From Swiss-Prot:
GO biological process: cell wall organization; peptidoglycan biosynthetic process; peptidoglycan turnover; regulation of cell shape
EC class name: transferase
Organism lineage string: Bacteria, Pseudomonadati, Pseudomonadota, Betaproteobacteria, Neisseriales
Keywords: ATP-binding, Carbohydrate metabolism, Cell shape, Cell wall biogenesis/degradation, Kinase, Nucleotide-binding, Peptidoglycan synthesis, Transferase
Top-level taxon in the UniProt lineage: Bacteria
InterPro entries associated with the record: AmgK, Aminoglycoside_PTrfase, Kinase-like_dom_sf
Annotated protein name in UniProt: N-acetylmuramate/N-acetylglucosamine kinase
Enzyme Commission designation: 2.7.1.221
Pathway(s): Cell wall biogenesis; peptidoglycan recycling
One GO MF term attached to the UniProt entry: kinase activity
Transmembrane segments: none
Family that this chain belongs to: Belongs to the kinase AmgK family.
Catalytic activity: N-acetyl-D-muramate + ATP = N-acetyl-alpha-D-muramate 1-phosphate + ADP + H(+); N-acetyl-D-glucosamine + ATP = N-acetyl-alpha-D-glucosamine 1-phosphate + ADP + H(+)
Length: 334
């Protein structure tokens, strides 16, 4: 509440001659919160509150300028010392909200194709040396969240010697081909919850953790989501659509689609291991229970993919030992 009062006082200095109502709008998985300031004439802005003792708004401001080729929120005012940023208001309707309201496959595909178009535009603008690299150390730190948080906390187990061997074999097999993929700008959380339904182009949110990394990463984030799931044939068609657009745009994807699909699936393994660990950490460390029920979806993704590739047999064996081989119940599937 103290932060909200401080934000309101700051906004009164930014808009000294305008009355406004300040209401809660949204919260992220980290410490950021968003409020909507609605003025007497009905117009509104969105205010980011990022406590400076917990995080800096500097990465957000840097990437916001870098990603100006897509429809990111415009920064109207900012105070980096206080951790406050005023943004133009892109509305309330995320792609996820729109999809849950309109559950037809045709409507979902239309939205996802819009998102893919924006992703290609973002990737076309990529330049080396601008963003931090998505390197081996980062990938390794991320996937180690799986044994550290999912296995240790969610399952309450410690890997046996044999299981540690299976895990190490997985890491040694998985990371080299991912690191060998051509690199582009990676949003890192390009999901339907972070895309806004706006007039014209989709709004793109939550980009502050962007890196320079594997070209298939953001497509995996979009099509193998935490909160909504589509049949594999539907996803396959959209991966093909992306691959065709990427080739036409001159992006560095393989000429053979089956090779690109392998990139996509293996990249998904890294992301799914990471997210399962993060969702467990959000619950056990941070007390946030919103994400924990979606962990089974990532376990299903992981089992399906690791079953398909002989090289990933150690991961499949480990998953079967830890959580069995039955499909786990999840939320929305289309």
């Amino acid at each position: 509440m103290q932060r909200q009062i401080k934000l309101k006082n700051w906004l009164q200095t930014v808009y000294p001659e305008r009355d406004f109502d300040l209401t809660f709008a949204a919260a992220d998985a980290d410490f950021r919160r968003y409020f909507r300031a609605t003025f007497s004439d009905g117009s509104s802005v969105v205010c980011m509150d990022a406590p400076p003792d917990k995080m800096s708004v500097a990465p957000y401001l840097k990437v916001q300028k870098l990603f100006d080729m897509v429809n990111v929120p415009q920064v109207l005012h900012a105070d980096t010392d206080l951790g406050f940023v005023v943004l133009n208001d892109l509305g309330n309707t995320t792609f996820l909200t729109a999809m849950l309201q309109e559950q037809g496959e045709t409507a979902h595909k239309a939205l996802l194709l819009e998102a893919i178009g924006e992703l290609v535009e973002l990737q076309k603008a990529s330049r080396e040396g601008v963003l931090p690299e998505y390197d081996r150390e980062t990938m390794l730190r991320e996937i180690n969240l799986f044994p550290e948080w999912f296995v240790a906390k969610e399952l309450g187990r410690e890997l046996t010697f044999k299981q540690r061997q299976l895990w190490q074999q997985t890491v040694d097999t998985l990371l080299p081909p991912l690191l060998a993929q051509p690199k582009v700008y990676v949003h890192r959380d390009f999901i339907v919850r972070n895309l806004m339904l706006t007039r014209g182009r989709p709004g793109v949110l939550d980009f502050q953790d962007a890196l320079y990394g594997p070209i298939s990463y953001d497509l995996v984030s979009l099509l193998r989501d935490a909160f909504i799931e589509w049949e594999e044939e539907f996803v396959l068609d959209l991966v093909i659509r992306y691959w065709e657009k990427a080739r036409a745009a001159g992006l560095p994807v393989p000429e053979a689609f089956d090779e690109f699909y392998r990139w996509f699936e293996w990249m998904g393994v890294q992301r799914h291991l990471k997210v399962a660990g993060i969702f467990a950490r959000l619950y056990y460390r941070d007390g946030k229970d919103k994400y924990r029920p979606e962990i089974p979806r990532f376990l299903n993704y992981l089992r399906r993919v690791s079953r398909r590739y002989a090289e990933l047999a150690p991961l499949y064996a480990l998953l079967v030992e830890l959580v069995g081989d039955e499909e786990l119940e999840t939320g929305f599937t289309f």
